[in-house]
Amino acid sequence: MTLSFTKMHGLGNDFVVIDGRQNDPALETATIRHLCDRRFGIGCDQLVLLTPPTLAGADVHVRFFNPDGSEAGACGNASRCVAKFVGGAPTLQTAAGLLPTAQDGDLFTVDMGTPRLDWQDVPLSRACDTLHLPLHDAAACSMGNPHATLFGDAFRAEALGPGLERDPLFPERANIGFAQILSPIHMRLRVWERGAGLTLACGSGACAAVVNAVRRGLTERTCTVTMDGGDLRITWREDGHVFMTGPAVTVFHGTTA
């Protein structure tokens, strides 16, 4: 099957975007894994599939797939890329809900919705205080996908990430953030992403880290999050909505053989 695609990235978090709005390719798991493979396929942190919306108010239906073929509920960096790809400040229909977007020059903002803080909604496998998990004292929330944030000055993300992602406390596995608070308006973050491993940036992980930091009184509601790939500006508004602002880049267009 021949597929047209666009390679994009947000702060080095890279994506293969397939526009199926006119003809849904109905990708199988094996095909997704192959396309995401950096040696035998195109290579990416996630594959993004666009199809026609099914909800009123949405401009495009977006699905996010990890390199292992599993589906993610949300991806902040990919959402900014989709906003650029589609144009016109689209509202995205995702498994996490409707995500409005906006553009200001080269920067794209996504309303990531409201975080879910109850243990059942993360979800966790048992009742826990999501602000202080019995797991490295992490804090947890859902941004449409499960996140846990560890706060400290030095973490070996590559060593801790795989085990924490699959800890029995997370029945759906989890994205694991390793955050260092630099000031009340600035943090350093690395994220071990569920199904993808350590990436250069994670938009939903940055949102979760700021939410969890604010809950602990560590930062203000607007915070710059510096990751290996660059900076995002995250704002957790008083009305509960989390806004993520950052760049989106088109790298090239191609067609599979």
UniProtKB/Swiss-Prot annotation:
Domain of life: Bacteria
First-tier enzyme category under EC: isomerase
Keywords: Amino-acid biosynthesis, Cytoplasm, Isomerase, Lysine biosynthesis
SUPFAM superfamilies: Diaminopimelate epimerase-like
InterPro entries: DAP_epimerase_AS (IPR018510), DAP_epimerase_DapF (IPR001653)
GO BP annotations, alphabetical order: lysine biosynthetic process via diaminopimelate
One MF annotation (Gene Ontology) recorded for this entry: diaminopimelate epimerase activity
Entry keyword Nucleus: no
EC number: 5.1.1.7
Pathway: Amino-acid biosynthesis; L-lysine biosynthesis via DAP pathway; DL-2,6-diaminopimelate from LL-2,6-diaminopimelate: step 1/1
Binding site for substrate: 13, 46, 66, 76-77, 145, 175, 193-194, 203-204
The UniProt record lists the keyword Amino-acid biosynthesis: yes
One GO term describing the cellular component: cytosol
Subunit structure: Homodimer.
Function, in words: Catalyzes the stereoinversion of LL-2,6-diaminopimelate (L,L-DAP) to meso-diaminopimelate (meso-DAP), a precursor of L-lysine and an essential component of the bacterial peptidoglycan.
Protein name (record): Diaminopimelate epimerase
Gene that produces this protein: dapF
